[in-house]
Amino acid sequence: VNLSTLFFVFAFLPVSLILYLLCPRVCKNALLILVSFLFYAWGSPVYLLLLLLVTVFNYCIGRDIGNRVESEQRGAKFVLVFGVLFNLLLLGFYKYTAFAIETLNAFLPFTLNAPSPALPLGISFFTFTNLSYLSDVYHRRAPGQKNPLDFCLYVSFFPKMISGPIVEYAHIAPQLKEHPVTLDKVSDAVPMLVLGLAKKVLLADNLGTAFQSISALSPGSLSGGSAWLGAIFYSLQLYFDFSGYSDMAIGMAKLFGFDFEANFDHPYLSGSLTEFWRRWHISLGRWFRDYVYIPLGGSRVSTAKCVRNLLIVWILTGLWHGASWTFAAWGLYHGILLLLEKYPLKGVLEKTPSPIRHILTLLAVIIGWVLFFSPDFSSALFYLGRMFGAGSRAFWDSTAKYYFATNWKLLLIGILGCGPWIRTLYQRLVFSRRGLGLALSALLLVGIFLLCVPYMMNATYQSFLYAQF
């Protein structure tokens, strides 16, 4: 299932939108649920029943919590804990059982057989969606949902189902009953859809091809320069892939009358890791802040407990992305660096010139992505070793020169695309008082869209990276 396929762009989305606009108001949510289930079945038909059962379960648990929370606090808390454990155990079974058993096998004198069930599409995202609902109802941030169709739509709404953004229930609850489609929403949605699609098929997929070519090099052929180019290609690919999906999801939500909050805010312009994580995958960071970090005590505790809380959150963040120790190490890596920024290095960094802080942040993030994309620690250490001069090959050898010479234009466009300049130029065209500006902006969008079509026709398109999480 992919938002950047010809079938989705030219058939599934427009047909769904036309039916939605023609549908009577009382049936609109039911139609969106049907469309969302068809979308899910397109990508994961085996687990459609699981999605439905999980949705029914959480609806019932939420109703029970809502009925108890005012008069029976202890009972409501018991039901909340039961609901949370059920969701986490389900996620754990499908995503972490094999990982846990493989880890145990390393210490046991015998070998346990690890089950390997296929991962249900979007399970990490819809699990966090359900946990948000149960917590928000218990803490009275929003009333429990009485209408089962409205709740089903909250969980299964197809634009956010596969790769987010993770929409907290308290934010979306007021929109579930009434979400009118307006001209302003449509005018915001179309550029987000087109530019999000362009990020994916024009930038992310081509950057991914360059990264895969470097990853395919034999260990003896990988020089320091090639390794750095590969890490930069991946850093840009991941950003454009995921932010492109988020833009498309937010744009599609607007077409159906919903307002989702932004999920990215030019993270590679950050001057610190703290700032980077306020700008990257904003909905996930907000979820961990609201439902894990703050309940643990947040920053309003002793320094030792604050350190504990931050490390717990970041190890969990790493494991949320994938069931392996490299993901856990990636989370721990960022947790430690954030603690260093917060405590011993705070004064030093405040006195450091902004350009240097920006470069240091980029270096820290790129090094972290090596852990993120490496299948195991030995691969990560080998790759990092090459980046920092290990091995007998010249740093900037003929292979590195070749990859730079064949991809420098893509690299330049990618770097420029990380900033707000292209969007600012488009907005200036749109808000120009002259009709010419509006016409030029429309032509620009049409041109970008037409440029995307040949890439969508290519049968070797790549699925969105975050769909695997």
Sequence positions of predicted segments:
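Membrane-embedded transmembrane alpha-helical bundles that form the catalytic cores
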Residues: 1-468
